[in-house]
Amino acid sequence: DGNLDFTLDVEDDDEIGQLCQNFEEMRIRLKESTEEKIQYDKESKELISNISHDLKTPITAIKGYAEGLMEGVASSPEKRDKYIRTIYNKANDMDRLINELTFYSKIDTNKIPYTFSKINVANYFRDCVEEVGLELEARGIELGYFNFVDEDVMVIADAEQMKRVINNIIGNSLKYMDKKNGIINIRILDVGDFVQVEIEDNGKGIGQKELPYIFDRFYRTDSSRNSSKGGSGIGLSIVKKIIEDHGGKIWATSKLGIGTEIHFVLRKTAGDAQQ
């Protein structure tokens, strides 16, 4: 009947005993495999449910504001501009969510398409900040950028996937921003053989009990489970996977009511690292 919740007690060391030992080891492997599949199926269903919920929210907003534009509710240029900005922001939310789902499927099959190359740290992050700055400005979020590395420092990285890291971290900050005057600061630091990137927000923050788990797949904080913010629960796990595949390390610090700071490090190229 498929029941694997039993134990084969092995008492003798003869052929029968060895056979029983082999069966017991096989039973354990089968039980572990079955439990992993059950957990995977549960997580997949949760992911589909989360994403379905998260897609409905921006779609409803886009439809509502589009109808307002068509019906002339936005009677002034300022109001029309506000409606258009909202539609643009919600479309970005949907795009980010769909990209997360697509990338998650690649993680699940270990088929992440990395293209590593030498990247100039100062130039790369300056360009990233300019790109995300447009969306943050549209959302009324103040963006600060502080680069403390020399102009010629290089790292080996996949430019596209590192951009995904930045976008996912900032997207998470936006999702849980609860301040009227939202602030996101990006700092690039020189720490010996490594470049350290810090992305700090002044959002609602994360409790100390939840903090160690925020990079786990499908994990969502209690506050996100109990709010309309939702979340697929895979955004930061994707970030962790990419950073670790780059040979780096990632961690977070946070205080409830004050904000969260995500830190990650990338090793400099051999010529830039301290000898």
Positions of PLM-derived features:
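Short beta-strand/loop element within the Bergerat-fold HATPase_c
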Residues: I183-D193
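Short conserved segment of the HATPase_c
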Residues: I206-R220
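Short helix-loop "hinge" at the ATP-lid/N-box region of the Bergerat-fold HATPase_c
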Residues: S173-L174
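Acidic ATP/Mg2+-coordinating residue in the GHKL
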Residues: D201
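A conserved beta-strand-to-alpha-helix junction within the catalytic ATP-binding
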Residues: D13, T115-G133
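Membrane-proximal HAMP signal-relay module
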Residues: D1-S49, K63-E71, R85, R217, ...
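Conserved micro-motifs of the catalytic ATP-binding
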Residues: T109-Y114, M154-A157
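Conserved catalytic submotifs in the C-terminal HATPase_c
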Residues: D9-E11, T115-I119, E137, E142-V153
